[in-house]
Amino acid sequence: MWAGCHPDAASLLRLLLAALLAAGALASGEYCHGWLDAQGVWRIGFQCPERFDGGDATICCGSCALRYCCSSADARLDQGGCDNDRQQGAGEPGRADKDGPDGSAVPIYVPFLIVGSVFVAFIVLGSLVAACCCRCLRPKQEPQLSRAPGGPRLVETIPMIPSASTSRGSSSRQSSTAASSSSSANSGARAPPTRSQTNCCLPEGTMNNVYVNMPTNFSVLNCQQATQIVPHQGQYLHPPFVGYTVQPDSVPLTPVPPFLDGLQTGYRQLQAPFPHTNSEQKMYPAVTV
């Protein structure tokens, strides 16, 4: 019916559809696939025309290493003949190629850097451990060093102990010999022959020295034994009085009191009102004239 009634309208509709298809084809343009440039950098593909191109730049032009959109059909690029539009290893899932955009080459100096850092860390840790050990052991060594000087001090003070004991022994010996001399003098007042026997055992000039300390065993020893035991005159003398003797004629004698016996040699024993037994030997001070 449309063909019999309106033959021009059918042909007009056909022309309109062809124009719309041609306009859509011109508006879409060609697609430039992605590629690797000369520096090995991957370039992403794009649709012609691009954003900054004109409306008529619908053809992919250029070379395999550099592609762009243009409107000249003579500069059109045959993308089928290029071999750099595929990424190497892209077909294997989970694998990234070193030359691809996702892959990166490992530098050569990285292993040396790792080994050097481990060596330096080992040295630093060893130094810290050594410093801690030295600091922990130092307080234990200080008391031992402080005790060491005390040893010679103790050794130095030890020889002073016998000297103290010797001085004490000499003082006790002097006191005992003084008491024995006074007792022997008192016994000599009672029995002059015994005293003369004792005097014969001593060397000449010993009895004239009032500072001589006579041992207690001289009264019971005979002359031969006493002569061997009698020490040197200066052994029992105090240092300030060594070499000094009593001058018998330098001091004038005072008159003898009536209560003293003039027959004795200058002193006698005071008589007690009650005599004591032989077991109790009492000491009385001697009175000199």
From Swiss-Prot:
Residues 1-27 form the signal peptide. Keywords: Developmental protein, Endoplasmic reticulum, Membrane, Signal, Transmembrane, Transmembrane helix. It comes from the Eukaryota. It is a single-pass type I membrane protein. One of its GO terms (biological process) is negative regulation of fibroblast growth factor receptor signaling pathway. Residues 126-289 are cytoplasmic. Residues 28-104 are extracellular. Residues 81-102, 162-198 are annotated as: Disordered. Residues 163-191 have a biased composition (Low complexity). It is found in: Endoplasmic reticulum membrane. One of its GO terms (cellular component) is endoplasmic reticulum membrane. Belongs to the shisa family. This is Protein shisa-2 homolog. It comes from Bos taurus. The gene is SHISA2.
